[in-house]
Amino acid sequence: MRRSVHSLAAVAAVAALGLAACSGGTSSSSSADAEQTYGPGALPTVTEGKLTVATSDPAYSPWILNNDPASGEGYESAVIYALAEELGYSADNVQWVRATFESSITPGAKDWDLNIQQFSITDERRNAVNFTSPYYTTSEAIIAKAGTPAADAKSIADLKDVLIGVQAGTTSQQFASDTLEPGLSQKLQMFNSSDDTVLALQTGRVDAIVVDLPTAFNMIATQVDNGVIVGQFADAQDGENYGIVLPKGSKLTPTVSAAVDRLAESGKLDELHEKWLNEAQNVPILK
């Protein structure tokens, strides 16, 4: 479930305090942003006059529809085009590239300005890359096949004997390792990709899988036969924040983060959420 735009804006205000250090600047991000000239050629992008944005390959709904980020369809694609407009770039001046999840949060030179693919903001990742203010807040969820013992769980304790799978290297894996595994009778099963994780559930190699809530809704609609969302593990105030990634030390960080803040404050992020991520049912919280 997502945090309200007002709460996101409050988080953004706190996050902004650290942006100057992240970007190498010494003045406040708000004053720097106020003096910034926007538009093609005005910002220090990797390709002059263009805003280059990376995402995963493939990219999944509801974040990007039909693996086509340039369509503007799906929450993250729509956020990028709203952000580009805020920065003075037309849709024609946005160009997309692909990057793996792990390479995107590894130190080193990048061929993109921004990267969006459900990156949770963590202190560890801040050592390697910069983040904008949050554009979305979610929680982890657990999926199982309907009619199985795993699907009947009403609490975390009920998951004790459930064999759980998760994609390695994700915050879902970190959450499951830290919060769930100590109380499980069996070790977590790790998989290299989202598709491998789903396949493990489909074929019975695991009883349930842990993913973020919007992905869970998409999986039970399009990938997992007879799948159900058993529950989520946090409410709207305790979920994890997603931020757009920039290369470490990027001079764009304060400007882009301030633009994300404006989208939150104006209600645009709420509007896009209602269009692309409006969950159709209430999901119980497992405690």
Each language-model region and where it sits:
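C-terminal motif of bacterial Sec signal peptides marking the signal peptidase cleavage site
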Residues: 16-21
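Extended ligand-binding regions for polar small-molecule ligands
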Residues: 23, 77, 81-86, 170, ...
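Ligand-binding clefts/hinges and TM-proximal coupling segments of bilobed small-molecule sensing domains
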Residues: 24, 28-34, 171-188, 228-229, ...
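Extracytoplasmic small-molecule ligand-binding "clamshell" domains
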Residues: 32-115
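Bilobed "Venus flytrap"/periplasmic-binding protein-like clamshell domains
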Residues: 53, 72-87, 119-120, 138-195, ...
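Periplasmic-binding protein-like
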Residues: 57, 137-144, 214, 221-261, ...
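Acidic, polar ligand-binding/catalytic clefts
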Residues: 93-156
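A ligand-binding cleft/hinge motif common to bilobed small-molecule-binding domains
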Residues: 103, 119-128, 177-178, 202-203, ...
